[in-house]
Amino acid sequence: MELKATKITGLADHLFRHEAGKMVSVLTKIFGTENLETAEDVVQQTFIDALQVWKLKGIPDNPSGWLFRVAKNKAIDVIRRNKHSVQYNFGDDERLLLKSEYTLAPAMENLWKEEVIQDDLLRMMFACCHPDISEENQITLILKTLCGFSTAEIAKAFLTSDDTVSKRLYRTKEFFRQKK
């Protein structure tokens, strides 16, 4: 049983490093970069669910596909809960599709296609490299959000403290919230 849990945790770590950035990119397209923390929360909850479900039911045949499906469903839940909220600034192309229950599922399906995800990763990278954000903060956000590095790993690479990296991330996310 412990070997199975170790295997699942190792797989989840690997998938987080390789898939979380893609999920955050799509989710920030849906929710807007000013709601980056909402996107990260959805991704984190998706991985928590994966660890819990996979320990009970085993690893699915396509773990990445499972993660994307759960993240997509969680995003739909957030949209439904906040349908009338002005907090989420849906993109122009998605705004009408995501606000209608009839078009919500097909619109979400299109947003999670591989070629769209690649465009979203690039879009998110450009957003992280906004000229009003310092170079250190740009790199820190990209490493954390798109590459899946931990705060400790980033701190070690920058020869700085975890606290400094956390502050950089906070300031950058605050910039996006204010940019709304």
Regions flagged by a language model, labelled:
Residues E19, R168:
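Residues within the DNA-recognition helix of helix-turn-helix
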Residues D41-I48, D61-N73:
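Structural recognition of an alpha-helix C-terminal capping motif at a helix-to-coil junction
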Residues K72-F90:
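Arg/Lys-rich amphipathic alpha helix in sigma70-family domain 2
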Residues V86-Q118, L122, C129:
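Internal acidic/polar
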